[in-house]
Amino acid sequence: MKKVITTLLLALLQISCFAVSVETTTNLNVYYPEYTKIDLVCGQMPKATEKNVEFCCEAAFTGELLNEFKHLNIADNHICNGVMKKGYRCKANTGGFVWGKGKWKFMRKADYPTEANGWNMGFCQMLIIKDGSARPIGTKMKNNKNIYRALCEKDGKLCIIESKKVVTYEFFVKCLSDYKVTHALYLDMGRGWNYAWYRDKAGKVVVLHSESKMAPTYKYRTNWITFYK
C-alpha cells in the first residue's frame, strides 16, 4: 500500500513540476511552461494525446498554399530536432531564436546561425523587442489589428504572451514593453492557424482558440514551437 501511495505522490509531483503557469495583465495572457526540451515540430501539429507535450503553437511564417509539406515552404532556415533545414528567404523576418539544452538566444536575423552547431531548434520571425528596446514598427504594420502572440523572455524565463483581444500591433508592442520583457519574437497568428493548446497544473489540456472544422484545408499551418516535459 505504501508503494502505491508513493507512486501516486510521485506522479502528482511530476504533473505539478511540469506544467504551464498562467499570469494575466489588463491586456495580456502570459504562459510560462516548465519544460526539459523545446523543438520546432514541422509538418504535423503535436496532438493533445501526446502526454509529454506541454505547450505548442504556430511559430514561423508559411509561404504558399501547398498540398504537401515542404521545409522550403517555411520562412527562412530553421532547426528541427538538431538539424538545420532550408526555408525560403523572407524579407519580413528581422530576428531569430535558437534553443539548446539549458540555453537559448534571441538575435537579429543577421546573427542567425548557418548551421545547427548544437542547437536543438530554431526559427526566424519578426523581432519585436531586443534587450528591452522595441524595434521600429513599419507604418503599414502598426495599425494592423489581430490577436497577437509572441515568444518572449521575462526575468530570465521563456514565455508565450498573447493579447486578450483584437488590438493594433503597435498597442501589442506597447503592452509587451510595459510588461518589461527583455526579448520578444513574433509568432504566426491568423484565422485557421491561431489554434494552440497547453497542459495546466492538473494535467488538463487547455485550448487557445478552438480548431476550426475547416482545419484540414488550412495549408498555412506547417510548424509549431513545442515545449516538452
Residue spans for each PLM region:
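Gly/Ser/Thr/Pro-rich low-complexity, intrinsically disordered segments
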Residues: C17-K229
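Sec-dependent N-terminal signal peptides
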Residues: V4-I15
